[in-house]
């Protein structure tokens, strides 16, 4: 009886964790729900700087699409987190060489309360290089 209850509890916990799973595509689909900051930097300047900034933070670029202005980033599991998925969305604003950068940060598991919100550190690093609007 105890074994059956334990297995039921274990299956329920697994289902709960799996139901909150986030993929890199989910982070991209959440456009508009991240932290948005505008910078005095051309799209080209921002695009060429972002991989360096992400590397400094220990993040790995999983895929990029310059035409869409999308960098998809993954951070593996650690002692404190099951990992994170981050979408960095870059778009041109106006004709004066300004860009809008949105960072959407999601835990790899929806129930992952200790996942890092990468928006703040990414925007802090970018603000060291470019002036915010």
List each language-model region with its residue ranges:
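N-terminal export leaders
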Residues: 3-7
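Ser/Thr-rich, low-complexity intrinsically disordered terminal regions
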Residues: 22-133
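Hydrophobic helical h-region of N-terminal Sec-dependent signal peptides
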Residues: 10-15
């Amino acid at each position: 009886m105890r074994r059956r209850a334990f297995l039921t509890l274990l299956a329920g916990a697994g289902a709960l964790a799996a139901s909150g799973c986030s993929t890199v595509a989910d982070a991209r689909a959440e456009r508009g729900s991240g932290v948005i900051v505008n910078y005095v930097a051309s799209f080209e300047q921002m695009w060429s700087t972002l991989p360096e900034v992400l590397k400094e933070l220990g993040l790995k670029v999983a895929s990029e699409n310059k035409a869409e202005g999308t960098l998809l980033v993954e951070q593996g599991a650690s002692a404190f987190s099951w990992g994170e998925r981050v979408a960095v969305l870059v778009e041109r604003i106006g004709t004066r060489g300004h860009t809008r950068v949105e960072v959407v940060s999601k835990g790899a598991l929806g129930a992952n309360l200790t996942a890092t919100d990468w928006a703040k550190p990414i925007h802090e690093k970018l603000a060291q290089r470019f002036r915010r609007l």
